[in-house]
A protein has these predicted regions:
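Sec-dependent N-terminal signal peptides
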Residues: 25-30
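Short, conserved catalytic or interaction motifs in soluble domains
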Residues: 38
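Bacterial N-terminal signal peptides that target proteins for export
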Residues: 2-24
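Short, surface-exposed polybasic-aromatic patches that bind anionic ligands, especially phosphate groups
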Residues: 45-336
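C-terminal motif of bacterial Sec signal peptides marking the signal peptidase cleavage site
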Residues: 34-35
Length: 336
């Protein structure tokens, strides 16, 4: 779901289709180890399918849109219409966790050191992709697993140079000696720079993916999420609003939400009955909200795969619905 237009249909994605895995320890070489090793690793998971903490390091500067407190920002005049289009009665769905139907759920990422060897990457959309080589380690986890026919994202963080490398529809060639991908983007995590106007990334909206994921290390270890999150809607407009840089639709109806639309959980929602870990996520949704980043199922919230997640606990979020959210007032909507 990238550069090409999305036809006017409601796309119902299974929980497996939107996201996959996590972070790997900062050590001299990138290795993929599992946080909860067991004899029952999911199919297609890389050797040692990992989870780790990123030790609280914040992505992007404090004044970056991802890190902005929007709890007091005005509500957009079109909020009700836009929420209805996305699905006012749809439950908030955690599109991450442990496994579903035998496969891992959540978007994976891996951490490497600055001396990680770079490998060449060939892109389908090379005119809107940042050229390689990329520091992709052997055995880097792919969203959905090696045989996935989904979005197949690969996310790599160079922790020494504080850069993020992301691929969409990524396929290793010759055991990872090189890769092919639909598109790719490199983000300087110490900068506020955006993609060029009109450019995609590894995400439909031209946004980075990793900064918008719910991560186990934040929720359970740090007990705070200090940034916006990422979600999807079934249909979108041929338009985007900053910090998004790209649209992925042919629809021009103003009732359709533009990419980059930011929503927040209403301040009136009582969080006291939710599990403590879920409250961490919901407080972030009140304070920082979440960006519309791709076409997908209604109010699917993205996060990392981690075998330590409690899926039943995360499921408590489904008690919330689209109508519990409101659109934060948008700036200039770009349609060309």
């Amino acid at each position: 779901m990238k550069k090409r237009d999305i036809p006017p249909v409601v796309m119902m994605l299974s929980p497996m289709s939107a996201a996959m895995r996590q972070f790997v320890a900062l050590i001299a070489a990138p290795i993929i180890i599992t946080a909860c090793k067991s004899a029952t690793n999911p199919p297609d998971s890389p050797p040692g399918d990992t989870t780790v903490s990123i030790t609280g390091r914040r992505m992007f500067p404090a004044d970056n849109p991802w890190n902005k407190d929007i709890s007091s920002e005005p509500v957009d005049p079109a909020s009700d219409v836009l929420i209805n289009t996305c699905g006012a009665s749809a439950p908030l769905h955690p599109d991450f966790g442990t496994t579903w139907e035998g496969g891992p759920i959540g978007i994976p990422f891996v951490v490497v050191r600055g001396d990680q060897p770079r490998v060449p990457v060939t892109f389908d959309y090379d005119d809107e992709s940042d050229p390689g080589p990329y520091p992709i380690p052997p055995g880097a986890p792919i969203e959905g697993g090696a045989s996935s026919n989904g979005d197949r994202h690969v996310l790599v963080v160079d922790a020494d140079n504080w850069k993020l490398y992301e691929l969409f529809d990524a396929h290793p060639v010759s055991s990872g000696a090189s890769w092919t991908a639909g598109s790719g983007a490199i983000f300087d995590l110490s900068s506020n720079s955006l993609r060029p106007a009109g450019w995609t990334s590894a995400d439909a909206a031209g946004l980075p993916i990793l900064p918008g994921l719910v991560r186990y290390d934040e929720v359970v270890e740090q007990k705070v999420i200090a940034h916006a999150l990422r979600f999807t809607c079934p249909t979108t407009r041929r338009a985007y609003v900053a910090p998004a840089r790209h649209f992925a639709s042919s629809r021009t109806d103003a009732a359709q939400p533009p990419m980059g639309m930011r929503v927040r959980l209403k301040a009136s929602v009582d969080l006291s009955s939710y599990p403590a870990n879920v409250q961490v996520i919901l407080r972030a949704l009140k304070t920082y909200g979440m960006f519309l980043a791709d076409n997908g199922s209604s109010f699917f919230l993205s996060g990392t795969h981690d075998m330590r997640w409690n899926d039943e606990e995360l499921g408590a979020m489904k008690r919330l619905h689209g109508r519990d959210f409101e659109v934060v007032r948008m700036g200039t909507i770009v349609t060309q």
